[in-house]
Structures are given as C-alpha cells and as structure tokens.
Amino acid sequence: MTILVLGINHKTATVALREKVAFSEEKRLSALNQIEQLKLAQSTVILSTCNRTEVYLHNKFIQPEQNSAWIDECVAWFAAIHQIQLTDLQDCLYFYQNQQAVTHLMRVACGLDSLILGEPQILGQVKQAYQLAEEYYQRAHGLGKSAVISSELSRLFQKTFSTAKRVRTETNIGESAVSVAYAACSLGRQIFESLQELTILLVGAGETIELAARHLLRHGVKKLMIANRTRARAEALVAKLESPFIEILSLSELQDGLNQADIVISSTGSPTTLISYEMMKQAQIQRRYRPVLIVDIAVPRDVEESIVKLDSVYHYTVDDLQNIINHNLSEREKASEQAEEIIAEECAAFFEWLKVRQASNLIRTYRESADEIRQELLEKAQFSLSQGESADKILDEFSTKLMNKLLHSPTLVMQTMVKQGDSRGLQNFLSVIKK
C-alpha cells in the first residue's frame, strides 16, 4: 500500500498562503479529475479547511524505486493547480507516507493537530471531505456505491472515524472550554442551572461574540440581545446566525438590555468603558437583585471593575477566563496522551487488516495464475488425445509440465531467500513442505 498525504496547515504556513491553496468545492472536483487523468492515484480525498489543506492519495502501483519521483510529481501538481511557485511551498509543504500518513490522519480527525487542541469540528470536516470524494467517483464512473474509493483508502477513513469516536468516548479531550467564547458560556452553565430560560445580552458584533452566540443558541437559549455601535454589523451577524430568537439593540438602549439580562458578555473595541457601576446598580434594582453574570472579554475593558461591589453580580474579565482556559488546556493535554495511545492501537489494527488483505490478494493471484496454467496445459493434453496420441505419454507430459510451471515461482522465491540470507523464511518454507 502506498498512501501519501501532502499539505500545509496553520503551523507551517501563513493565512495568506493557506488562502491560496484552499479548495472550493468546484476546484476540489476539478482536482480529483486531474489526479485521475494524470494517474497520480487510484483514489484521492481532499481536506480543505481554514487552517489546513491536505491531499490524501492512494496509489498501489508505485514501486519503491519510483517513490521519490512520484512524490515530486504530486508536489508539482499541487503547486500547478494553485498557480504557486514550488519555491513558495518548499518550507511550508509537508508529506507523510503509509504508517506516518495513517497516524497523521487519525491525529487530525481526533483534533490533536488542531489550532485548538481537541476541537470537535474537524471530524465533521474530514467526514465531509471523504463524502465529497465518494460522490465524485460515483458520478465520474457512472457506477453504484459498490465502485467508489479504493478499498484500502475507504477502510482507512472508516477506521479513522471509529478511532475519533473512541477518543471522544474514552477520553476528556473535548470536555473543557479552551476558547474565550466557550469559557464564557461554560461559566453561565455553572452559575445557572439551565441557559434555556435566561435572557442573554451580547455587547459587540465581532468574532468572539459570534462564537459565544453560536454556543448559546446551541444550548437552547430563546432570548438573545445583541447591542452594537453599528447596527449594520449587528444585522450582518444576525443574518449569519439564522436564529429567530435574536433582538438587536443600539448602544443607547444598553441600559434596557442590562435591566433584562441574566448574562452579559461584552467584547468591543471601545476605548472607554460602556457599562458603568451606576448602570449595573440601576439594572440590579430593576431586576430585584437576581444573580447576573458579567463577562468582560474586551481589552481595554468594557465594564467598570467596581461593579463587583454590587450584590448578586458575578464579574469575570479576560484574565479570569484565561486562567480557566489554561487549566482546561492542561486537562486536555493529559487527555491527548490517552488519545495518542488509542491512535497507536488503531493504527496497528489497520495495518494488521492490511497485512491479511495483502496476503489474501497474493494467495488469490497465485491460485488464479496456477489455474490458468492448468487450463492451458489441459487444453493441449485434450487436443493431443483427440489426435490419437498415447494417453500414458500425454499424462506424463501434462503432469511434468504442470509440476515445473507451478514450482517455478516458489523456486525463484527460495533462490532469493538464499541470496538474501533469509534463513528464517527458508525454515518456514521447509516446515510447510514437510507437512
């Protein structure tokens, strides 16, 4: 088996270069077609995310002496399809083969190679990449589901999916918050029994607020307010979130939002504070001092620190969240060690399956070859008999030729073992013959 993965990721390349080598769906289909036409691989899966672009190629016909040239061809194709000079890729492009490639794919799918350790989204992206490749081969060849990606590459990806599921089940790799937005939402779940009946106020409309909104909506929040200086940006964010449970406020309406909110998460670029002690005091009077969580992620801060003096106000800053994140990252690091052990086990299991498959293929090929020899000699013998030749003579010739032809390949193998000094192989061969 020859599986090659080549690619770049957030560790090896800048955002600018990663953008250049990204595959749109249309470009991905074109790439799969090119690889097939150039005979670079029998089957290919292309993974393209904001943090990585990787091409997984399977070519079972590559011989050891052809390997280096094949890799060069694949790299040249990768540069050509993205219209990039090879020199621009030299320090950024990595490639792995066979066992290293299998381990790498499993690490990627389990989130061990991600920007955020253990992030779960990558598994869905790997599954989607595999599904797109399957659909391409089905359409390209006009065949049913039985004739798609090569069995080796298919088995590898199926094994990878089950490995990722096992890692999620048996370790805590995805349990703890390791992003500021997620940590803020996790605090809310710790302080309040349920988020579903709470009113949430988000101040700002940037990436962190978007992530926080997605987390909250995923946990069933039914009333979400977004306050932002520029209404157009808030509207654009609401359009992306596609939820009917969001209300937009202007900053002049911020006090109204505070009067209702059980959780406030603020992340703006304002040079001055937006939420003062007096505003929170008024809000708490309106709220009859029900508990409120204020998470100030902004730098400089959006919320006056003195609000901690108010009753039932839980106030956290970005530094507090960073401490939580650092602790959680430490926990994920421990879980990642367990995940690596699981990956090593599953990788070994995949190669054990591959050995059995290759042995079965070898045996089947040898038996088919032997049957072809038998059929050829049998036809000749039958023709000789029909011509009235001696049956004893024909049977003797048939059996002698059959023996010589069938023993030719094993004899060559034994001669090679002798030349290579493979005494163990010869001993195993001899023990089988004696049986």
Swiss-Prot record:
This enzyme's EC code(s): 1.2.1.70
Pathway(s) annotated for this protein in UniProt: Porphyrin-containing compound metabolism; protoporphyrin-IX biosynthesis; 5-aminolevulinate from L-glutamyl-tRNA(Glu): step 1/2
Function text: Catalyzes the NADPH-dependent reduction of glutamyl-tRNA(Glu) to glutamate 1-semialdehyde (GSA).
Name of the protein in question: Glutamyl-tRNA reductase
Keywords on record: NADP, Oxidoreductase, Porphyrin biosynthesis
Extra remark: During catalysis, the active site Cys acts as a nucleophile attacking the alpha-carbonyl group of tRNA-bound glutamate with the formation of a thioester intermediate between enzyme and glutamate, and the concomitant release of tRNA(Glu). The thioester intermediate is finally reduced by direct hydride transfer from NADPH, to form the product GSA.
Keyword Transcription: no
Catalysis performed (reactions): (S)-4-amino-5-oxopentanoate + tRNA(Glu) + NADP(+) = L-glutamyl-tRNA(Glu) + NADPH + H(+)
Family membership: Belongs to the glutamyl-tRNA reductase family.
Swiss-Prot/TrEMBL site (Important for activity) positions: 104
GO aspect biological process, one term: protoporphyrinogen IX biosynthetic process from glutamate
Assembly behavior: Homodimer.
Any matching Pfam family: Shikimate_DH
GO function term, MF aspect, one: glutamyl-tRNA reductase activity
Residues reported to bind NADP(+): 204-209
EC category: oxidoreductase
Binding-site positions, substrate: 49-52, 114, 119-121, 125
Coiled-coil positions: none
Domain statement: Possesses an unusual extended V-shaped dimeric structure with each monomer consisting of three distinct domains arranged along a curved 'spinal' alpha-helix. The N-terminal catalytic domain specifically recognizes the glutamate moiety of the substrate. The second domain is the NADPH-binding domain, and the third C-terminal domain is responsible for dimerization.
Active-site residues (renumbered): 50
